[in-house]
Amino acid sequence: MRCIVVGLGVQGEKRAICAGKDYVSSVDPVNPKADFKKIQDVPLIAYDAALVCVPDNQKIHIIKYLIKNQKHILIEKPLLTNNLNMIKNIEKMAKQMKVVCYTAYNNRFEPHYIRMKKLITSGKLGKIYSCRMFYGNGTARLVKNSKWRDKDQGVLTDLGSHLLDTTKFWWDDIGEKFKFYSKNCFENRSPDHVIIGSEESSPRIELEMSLVMWRNHFTCDVLAEKGSAHISSLCKWGPTTFVYRKRVLPSGKPIERKITLKKKDPTWVLEYEYFKNICKKSQKTDLSRDYWILKVLQKIQRGK
């Protein structure tokens, strides 16, 4: 499968490396290393799929162009639009043209995320009471210096979309009623530290995201009837640890199993191989999770 990269920034360059021999050319209006300035300049005969890593406000028209010309699409998260129905329209168009439109959330391929999913699905935890996640990095100044990044909902759509996607990955039937617990603009014009949550969902969910965490970090605590499960850090920031604690009744030190990984971030390559495979199988486009994420984000912003 021959791929082009649209948007040759930090993410685009990563995608190009992961595509390996499949990568044929790049598109970027300002990066001098790019082969083309506009996607329309790339000969349609030269590629089968596009890895799209552009600002949110440019995504929809590029997606439509690619679908119209029967090209598979990997679009860097999040897939945002002011019109919620646009997500369904894109899905319908992709199905009609028999192409794959896949939104990239590479954290789905994090080993401990998958391990957590399996544990939750197994039922070993019993009734799950609560899930709290924290995702933070120290990019506040980089965002502040970027005109197109320091605007709108800031960290909520950037890192919050990751956390919502993870929530939906672990609990597919989770509800839509989330709200702000706190929202701060410590250094930036747009929010750079946000906490959202849902007390009406089962389990209850609390998601904290920050651009003012000077050492990049991720934590997760899942508390349940028969035990608990915890993740500390990600492979890219390693080492990353998964802990499963089995409850001892009526009380006492739990039986603990710990798995620590120290390895290079595998998620980008795994995600590209996944994308390549679903294109090969002509899997039908499913943007239902994108629809859910956008609906939740819109409700949070409206305070509903």
Residue ranges and their predicted role:
Residues 1-34, 168:
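N-terminal Rossmann-like dinucleotide-binding module
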